[in-house]
Amino acid sequence: MRQEPHIEQYRKEKATLKAHIQEPFKRYRDDLVVNWVLPHQLPFETERGVFSRILKNDFGAGGSHHHLWMAFYRPGRKRLTDVQLSHSVYPDRFAWGLYVGAYAKGLFRDALARTLDEDAIALDVLNVLIEQGYRLAFAPRVSRPAGHPEFDAPLDALPDGLAKAQGIWVRRTIPRNQVLALGPDLVAEALRAQEELWPLYRFWVDAENA
């Protein structure tokens, strides 16, 4: 799919993708629900609309993505209009992260404003994540262009240009061979990632009521 990101290639590989990617990803979701959402009584939608689609919504052009991602979201919102604790499957890696972007409208505006206004707190939270292997990135639009700068070393100040961002990402990835070696223990790594990302998640979500 990465070499031929088009609907015809998707049709050829649909059964394989379902058996080896989509269905295991759903079981991964189920494990997160049982081991994280339910025990902590988190108010998340975990069934409807939590997964991305392989085929692009590109007005009939027939394009497709070469990765899948999922994120739970709070009732009353949608996956794209909430702060996203995301889980992503790529051909060569798996990623955990946190994203907030302009699709979230007022929530994004409040989260960005709090980050800029309370920069000392934001830096402390971000630097802890960076030291744990996460990278910070942002872009002037909701999708991040390839090659856009990422920050993987502790910051002395918030990066220039952050105030004009339309999307902010904080992500940690592991390579494909490590994903395969982990097997079912990938869920344990996911639970650790949720714990690591939770302070920043609360910092952004609580900006609505700050």
Language-model features, listed with the residues they occupy:
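Intrinsically disordered, low-complexity regulatory segments enriched in Ser/Thr/Pro
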Residues: 75-114, 165-169, 173-176, 184
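Short, charged low-complexity intrinsically disordered segments located at boundaries
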Residues: 58-68, 102, 117, 151-163
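Short secondary-structure junction/hinge motifs that connect adjacent elements
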Residues: 32-56
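Compact, glycine/acidic-enriched structural inserts
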Residues: 42, 89-154
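Amphipathic, interaction-prone secondary-structure segments
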Residues: 47-84
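Long, solvent-exposed, polar/charged low-complexity segments
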Residues: 1-41, 140-210
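A generic structural signal for short, non-catalytic loop/turn and secondary-structure boundary residues
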Residues: 44-47, 63-65, 80, 89, ...
